[in-house]
A protein has these predicted regions:
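Active-site acidic catalytic loop and adjacent metal/ATP-binding pocket
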Residues: 37-50, 54-55, 88, 188-235, ...
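Conserved N-terminal boundary motif of the eukaryotic protein kinase catalytic domain
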Residues: 27-32
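Active-site activation/catalytic loop segments of kinase-like enzymes and analogous catalytic loops
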Residues: 233-266, 280-298
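ATP-binding pocket architecture of kinase catalytic cores
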Residues: 48-146
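Juxta-kinase regulatory segment immediately upstream of eukaryotic protein kinase catalytic domains
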Residues: 1-26
């Protein structure tokens, strides 16, 4: 019999995972285990006698053991500080990360508590509460230390590597690729020109767009720290700015977010000045993430309309906030949005949220 054909990204049986969870954790009877979505990782909603949880099964090779241990250490640090986050659950023997043998290789699995409540509604009041929660995480991790190594959210991570993934998709549009490269250089020079000692640095969530949280009463509970790492806090703040755009509702959310953040923690002038730069970095990083993961998500949706949308947004943002504009957008900058990745991945990729909630760039 021929050996099994190689696999790059399998879907683990929810029924088998339920049995494994019941045997491995002190959850009592596991009554349901359902796949929530596939994205950067696979997330399963777990219903058990001792409560609701979320199981994250990492893609093979997506994170190293040390990188996962860093995330776990940060979450447990936040838990000790009393910050509302979805916490990792340890097995009776003390292990928090398990490795499951999948056809494509070992896949890490971590069980988390479920964040209570519902998704935020995007109102000014809830954006204000969200800003307070972001500030509380930054404040609580000022003294976070760990021996585990994690990638930094630096310009190599946010620009250099994403651009390397983007280039093959824009070879037929060299003027547009050059425009993005030039804008990335503006970001690099702009960040370098800011007084380094005045930029707040430390632990960052890396994905504070507003959807990785639930609210119950006055409490906002954060989850999904898979993009976390040491970096500029201005980038963390800029992700929210990028997410909601500049229409009237977006501006109201941004103002409320800043008000909430400042009620818990100050924001320096250098950090505010860096936000427009990091909005561009976020837009480029996300497109690089999409381009780098076509083996699992497909590539047909990375079409000209997709790149038109990015160039149009970058051109408008640069003209308004950074001066000048990218020199070329091949063809008409389409107002139509690309179809986006497969529906199963959409909850993990914010750019493909419903049209009313998509970021502009």
């Amino acid at each position: 019999m021929a050996p099994p054909f190689p696999v790059t990204y399998s879907t683990l049986s929810a029924e088998a995972l339920a049995a494994w969870l019941e045997a491995s954790y002190e959850l009592g009877a596991v009554t349901a285990c359902r796949l929530l979505h596939r994205g950067l990782n696979d997330s399963y909603l777990v219903e058990a006698a001792r409560g609701r949880h979320v199981l994250r099964v990492y893609r093979a090779g997506w994170r190293t053991a040390d990188e996962i241990a860093y995330e776990v250490a940060a979450l447990e640090h936040l838990g000790r500080k009393g910050v509302a986050v979805a916490l990792p659950v340890r097995q009776p023997g003390g292990d928090v990360v398990d490795w499951l043998p999948a056809p494509e290789g070992s896949r890490a699995a971590v069980l988390f508590t479920h964040a209570p409540g519902r998704e935020l509604d995007g109102s000014s009041e809830e954006s204000r509460r969200y800003g307070r929660a972001v500030a509380s995480i930054h404040a609580a991790t000022d003294d976070f230390e760990t021996g585990h190594r994690r990638f930094a959210l630096d310009l190599d991570h946010l620009l250099t590597r994403p651009l390397a993934a983007i280039r093959p998709f824009l070879r037929h549009r060299p003027a547009d690729l050059d425009a993005i490269e030039r804008l990335a250089d503006i970001v690099r020079r702009g960040v370098a020109a800011l007084p380094a000692g005045e930029l707040d640095r430390g632990f960052c969530h890396g994905d504070f767009h507003g959807d990785n949280a639930h609210i119950e009463g006055d409490t906002v509970t954060m989850f999904d720290f898979d993009c976390c790492g040491p970096g500029w806090r201005a980038y963390d703040i800029a992700v929210f700015r990028w997410r909601w755009g500049e229409d009237e509702a977006g501006e109201a959310r941004w103002a409320a977010f800043l008000e909430g953040y400042r009620s818990e923690r100050p924001i320096g002038e250098a950090d505010l000045a860096a936000v427009p730069l990091f909005v561009v970095a976020r837009a480029i990083w996300l497109r690089g993430l999409h381009a780098a993961n076509t083996a699992d998500w497909g590539r047909s949706w990375l079409n000209d309309a997709y790149w038109d949308r990015l160039l149009k947004g970058l051109r408008e943002w640069q003209a308004k906030h950074l001066g000048g504009e990218p020199e070329s957008v091949s063809g008409a900058a389409s107002a139509a949005l690309p179809e986006g990745p497969p529906a199963a991945a959409r909850e993990a990729i914010v750019a493909d949220a419903p049209a009313t909630r998509r970021p502009k760039l």
